């Protein structure tokens, strides 16, 4: 194989090797330096939802259509591009987090961080606190939540709606200014387009 081909295919091969090894840390370090150990699917609510997910960082923005399901055995997330291509598939069974995507295309955000964000937004507050180190503080109200460490805000969230998976969930992770906005689609909406009469 010549050097040019190796240069072109090396990133894709590295990404596939990482996926094949299932070497995703179940205790990811969030922007700001605090680690969070993912909690079991059984400690969260059972639900399924179709959501429009917008991920923004550093002026760049990715939009996905996500199918998310949680039950006592596993959390599963499938992310589709606006054109319908599967760009991310993540499963978490309480022991191992596995992610896959098309060759040569990395996920828009660390899959373990994405699962952590879902847990901060949707899991009971006590379950979230169980995954945090002692110096981190998680405050969770009906519509707002905040993670802080040593007086610094690291994650803020706002949700609307009465029950999981909520109508909207907006999360900001500092200091990276990583924004994740999730909007639950209903039978009246499809792909962000209102189809109600």
Identify what each model region corresponds to:
Residues 23-27, 31-33, 50-52, 85, ...:
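Mature, soluble, non-transmembrane domains
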Residues 67-69, 91, 139:
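Well-ordered beta-strand positions
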Residues 2-12:
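Bacterial N-terminal signal peptides that target proteins for export
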Residues 74-76, 83-86:
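Primarily extracytoplasmic ectodomains and periplasmic/lumenal surface modules that are beta-strand-rich
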Residues 18-21:
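C-terminal motif of bacterial Sec signal peptides marking the signal peptidase cleavage site
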Residues 73, 93-95, 143:
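Envelope-exposed proteins and targeting segments
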Residues 41-76:
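Post-signal-peptide N-terminal segment of Sec-exported extracytoplasmic proteins
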């Amino acid at each position: 194989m010549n050097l040019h081909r190796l240069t072109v295919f090396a990133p894709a091969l590295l990404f596939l090797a990482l996926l094949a090894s299932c070497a995703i840390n179940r205790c990811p370090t969030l922007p700001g330096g605090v680690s969070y150990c993912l909690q079991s699917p059984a400690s969260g609510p059972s639900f399924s939802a179709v959501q429009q997910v917008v991920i923004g960082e550093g002026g760049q923005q990715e939009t996905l259509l996500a199918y998310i399901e949680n039950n006592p055995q596993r959390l599963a997330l499938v992310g589709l591009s606006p054109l319908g291509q599967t760009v991310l598939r993540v499963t978490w069974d309480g022991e191992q987090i596995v992610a896959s995507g098309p060759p040569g295309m990395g996920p828009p955000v660390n899959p373990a961080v994405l699962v952590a964000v879902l847990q901060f937004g949707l899991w009971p507050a006590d379950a979230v606190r169980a995954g945090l180190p002692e110096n981190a503080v998680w405050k969770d109200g009906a519509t707002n939540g905040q993670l802080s460490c040593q007086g610094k805000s690291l994650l803020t969230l706002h949700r609307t709606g009465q029950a999981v998976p909520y109508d909207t969930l907006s999360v900001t992770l500092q200091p990276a200014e990583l924004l994740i906005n999730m909007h639950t689609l209903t039978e009246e909406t499809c792909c962000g387009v209102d189809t109600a009469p």
